[in-house]
A protein has these predicted regions:
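Low-complexity, acidic/polar, glycine-enriched regions of mature
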Residues: 17-190
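Bacterial Sec-dependent N-terminal signal peptides
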Residues: 1-24
Length: 190
């Protein structure tokens, strides 16, 4: 009987230390943005208005986090409606055929205090490629309004649009091949 109680206690203790916690992005305090160089002399910025990001982790420092993100391509916003429609069309993202972009992390590796390399698979325009992004964990506080634990993150990196068949008829220097990604977010513990 003592062995059964000891075994049960061990299992419960191990489960308690490996419980996964879900964190959901606070849309009012999060953004998924990008920038691209135009004609080699200026930056054009944009974002996706409709997106979701979820993080699952069993550690307080998020060193074992799994990040999953989706965005509606048709929600692309550069501030110019005509350009947004062109970007959502077949020359670039082809939102009708590929309505969402997705990202799912495959690993997270420490890269200094509160910094990580976030590797994962990005599916964009029907093409899936591995990417590695920089993740900065900005800390966790108790949100004074909701009283919920809230964590902040920033993700940055660069992808090549040619890897995802985006705008092939618009070569550099008209549009740079490199697209900078910048996402900022607050995440509430669920």
């Amino acid at each position: 009987m003592k062995k059964i109680i000891l075994l049960a206690s061990t299992v419960i203790t191990l489960f308690a230390f490996t419980t996964l916690t879900n964190w959901k992005s606070d849309k009012a305090h999060s953004q998924l943005g990008f920038s691209i160089t135009h004609l080699g002399i200026s930056e054009v910025n944009g974002s996706f208005k409709n997106f979701d990001v979820n993080i699952t982790s069993s550690k307080d420092d998020f060193s074992d986090a799994v990040v999953e993100a989706t965005a509606d391509i048709a929600s692309i916003n550069t501030g110019i409606e005509m350009r947004d429609k062109h970007l959502a069309g077949p020359d670039f993202f082809n939102a009708e055929k590929n309505p969402r972009l997705t990202f799912k992390s495959t690993s997270i590796t420490p890269a200094g205090k509160n910094n990580y390399k976030l590797a994962g698979n990005l599916n964009l325009n029907g093409v899936t490629k591995p990417v590695t992004l920089d993740l900065w964990y900005r800390g966790t506080i108790e949100n004074p309004m909701s009283k919920a634990p809230t964590s902040g993150f920033q993700v940055t990196g660069t992808i090549k649009r040619s890897d995802f068949n985006l705008g092939a008829s618009f070569p550099a220097p008209m549009l740079s091949d490199e697209v900078k990604i910048k996402a900022d977010g607050e995440f509430a513990k669920q």
